[in-house]
Amino acid sequence: MKGLFAFGLGLLSLVNALPQAQGGGAAASAKVSGTRFVIDGKTGYFAGTNSYWIGFLTNNRDVDTTLDHIASSGLKILRVWGFNDVNNQPSGNTVWFQRLASSGSQINTGPNGLQRLDYLVRSAETRGIKLIIALVNYWDDFGGMKAYVNAFGGTKESWYTNARAQEQYKRYIQAVVSRYVNSPAIFAWELANEPRCKGCNTNVIFNWATQISDYIRSLDKDHLITLGDEGFGLPGQTTYPYQYGEGTDFVKNLQIKNLDFGTFHMYPGHWGVPTSFGPGWIKDHAAACRAAGKPCLLEEYGYESDRCNVQKGWQQASRELSRDGMSGDLFWQWGDQLSTGQTHNDGFTIYYGSSLATCLVTDHVRAINALPA
């Protein structure tokens, strides 16, 4: 999702130093079986959501309460930001994960750094929630590729081949992956949130994704790996999302050995297409995943009006393909009540306990549970 407003990251409570979250217990890492996901021994279709802000909370009770609500709603997968990049170290106890500078970068493993992610992983472990952790942002929110560009030069388009940027990106990957390599809470490592390379040959992202997924696999033999792209670049239609101008080729990227499943997003309102575009977009990605023998995950989707009627139709379209390429969906985004008030409403937020949550979470989970095994 692009264009997020900065979430209020003021100090909510004192944070105790936390050991690395290393997992344990009976839960197992998520797997794939053909075009279907396997979570804790169950093969099927799974629902989930996104929360870009949860890893930046400094009040442990807020983390726990949010995850309790997600788990009790029947959602199994939660996608979060595993990045928070800055070029200048913030004052006080503001949360940041990595400071990028040409003179030398720093990964923050302190109480206002990766220890916040530690707590999230630990809390997810105890609740059986599986996390997709995105490792960098294409967009400028929370630093992203732009923070690397500020430190090492070039552009976001050249970021994928910028040797110094990629060297530091891999250092950061190693720091994060090594902390949670044994945690059953990790569903997948995600190379980037919505990677694009506008006007580039699609080989740029293809080659980068091949190299980085190989690198992650060298660090972690067990957990799943995915790209995090929006699903742009598909044959058969000429509308904008099907075109290749953003530098991605969905079908080609599915051939990358160490990418275990395909991701795609859906925002008709942002893309200038009608809501009726949705079912076909889902069907075409499912077909591509089926042909590649990998699961498809509708990783982000949202609409800003008539949301119950519009989005439940998309959910139904995805569920109907649960044995034909689709294996899950994650709506954008989860909303909750924290100790500091409601989380940010970007126009797509679905708040816990709302009538919209009944329509798009409770009813959806019930329908998933009724699917044949």
UniProtKB/Swiss-Prot annotation:
Q: Which InterPro entries match?
A: Glyco_hydro_5, Glycoside_hydrolase_SF, MAN-like
Record carries keyword Ligase? no
Q: How does this protein's activity depend on the pH of its environment?
A: Optimum pH is 4.0.
Reaction(s) the record says it catalyses = Random hydrolysis of (1->4)-beta-D-mannosidic linkages in mannans, galactomannans and glucomannans
Cystine links in this protein are 197-200, 289-296, 308-359
Name any one Pfam family assigned in the record.
Answer: Cellulase
What PTMs does it carry?
Answer: Not glycosylated.
Record keywords: Isomerase included? no
Q: How does activity depend on temperature?
A: Optimum temperature is 60 degrees Celsius.
Cite the effect that the entry attributes to residue 194 to A: Reduces catalytic activity 100-fold
Q: What positions constitute the catalytic site?
A: 194, 300
**E.C. no:** 3.2.1.78
Q: Name one GO molecular function term.
A: mannan endo-1,4-beta-mannosidase activity
Sites where the protein binds substrate: 81, 193-196, 230, 267, 271, 332
Q: Which GO terms describe its cellular component?
A: extracellular region
Signal peptide region: 1-17
Q: Which GO terms describe its biological process?
A: mannan catabolic process
Q: Where in the cell is it found?
A: Secreted
UniProt keywords (A-Z) are: Disulfide bond, Glycosidase, Hydrolase, Secreted, Signal
Record PANTHER family: MANNAN ENDO-1,4-BETA-MANNOSIDASE 1, PTHR31451
Q: Which family does it belong to?
A: Belongs to the glycosyl hydrolase 5 (cellulase A) family.
Subunit details = Monomer.
Function according to Swiss-Prot or TrEMBL: Endo-1,4-mannanase that catalyzes the random hydrolysis of (1->4)-beta-D-mannosidic linkages in mannans and heteromannans. It is a crucial enzyme for depolymerization of seed galactomannans and wood galactoglucomannans. Hydrolyzes structurally different mannan polysaccharides, such as galactomannans, glucomannans, and beta-1,4-mannans from different sources, yielding principally mannobiose. Also has transglycosylation activity.
Name of the protein: Mannan endo-1,4-beta-mannosidase A
What species is given as this protein's source? Podospora anserina (strain S / ATCC MYA-4624 / DSM 980 / FGSC 10383)
